Swiss-Prot record:
Changing A13D: Decreases degradation by FtsH. Belongs to the YfgM family. Keywords: Cell inner membrane, Cell membrane, Chaperone, Membrane, Transmembrane, Transmembrane helix. Its main location: membrane. It comes from the Bacteria. Changing E5A: Destabilizes the protein, which is prone to degradation in early or late exponential phase. SUPFAM superfamilies: TPR-like. Pfam families: TPR_21 (PF09976). The lineage of its organism: Bacteria, Pseudomonadati, Pseudomonadota, Gammaproteobacteria, Enterobacterales. It comes from Escherichia coli (strain K12). This is Ancillary SecYEG translocon subunit. Changing E2 to A/K/Q: Stable under all growth conditions. Residues 1-23 are cytoplasmic. One of its GO terms (cellular component) is plasma membrane.
Length: 206
């Protein structure tokens, strides 16, 4: 760092700085202004895109929930074309529709697509929980257990424990199921879920 003896030295240093860097500063200012304009345009474009995606998502899922003709293919098209949170949410809605129709393979595929479309950890956790539940129904217990292993965070511990118990029980591992449910009961769990897991533990003894 340069040390100055008096105010004149500081003034001279400033003069030298602008003499040596004036052109670079001017270019920097121009680039900075250009970048600012570019950023504002990009930001405005992003807001408009998000607004359009939100509206299209609402229209798609509303049509699906109302059972309108061709609403499922239209929602599938929306989910496939929107590699973002809205696409992932559409995949969740579609997966539920497929589960209701007992088209479990389609539901699993739609959930896996949704996972690839979002970076939001909470949404990923929800999708993985749904996927694990579908995998248990498909008798894919090992796949369900692997899916559950990807879900992190204390807030999900009880629900994960409940599903883990179901997956293990479907494999005939009663002790593993008991351990999972006992861990779930001891976690930060709602009274209703705790009571349900305790009931499952009690049923193992019957």
């Amino acid at each position: 760092m340069e040390i100055y003896e008096n105010e004149n030295d500081q003034v001279e240093a400033v003069k030298r700085f602008f003499a040596e860097n004036g052109k670079a500063l001017a270019v920097g200012v121009i680039l900075g202004v250009g970048a600012l304009i570019g950023w504002r345009y990009w930001n405005s474009h992003q807001v408009d895109s998000a607004r359009s995606a939100s509206l299209a998502y609402q229209n798609a899922v509303t049509a699906v929930s109302e059972g309108k003709p061709d609403s499922i293919p239209a929602a599938e098209k929306f989910a496939a074309e929107n590699k973002n949170t809205y696409g992932a949410l559409a995949s969740l809605e579609l997966a539920q529709q497929f589960v209701d129709k007992n088209e479990l393979e389609k539901a699993a595929a739609q959930l896996q697509q949704g996972l690839a479309d979002t970076s939001d950890e909470n949404l990923k956790a929800v999708i993985n929980l749904r996927l694990a539940r579908v995998q248990v129904q498909l008798k894919q217990a090992d796949a369900a257990l692997k899916t559950l292993d990807t879900i992190k965070g204390e807030g999900w511990a009880a629900i994960v424990a409940d599903l883990r118990g179901e997956a293990l029980l479907s494999k005939g591992d009663k002790q593993g199921a008991r351990s999972a449910w006992e861990a779930g009961v001891k976690s930060d769990v709602t009274p209703a879920l705790s009571e349900m897991m305790q009931m499952k533990i009690n049923n193992l003894s019957i």
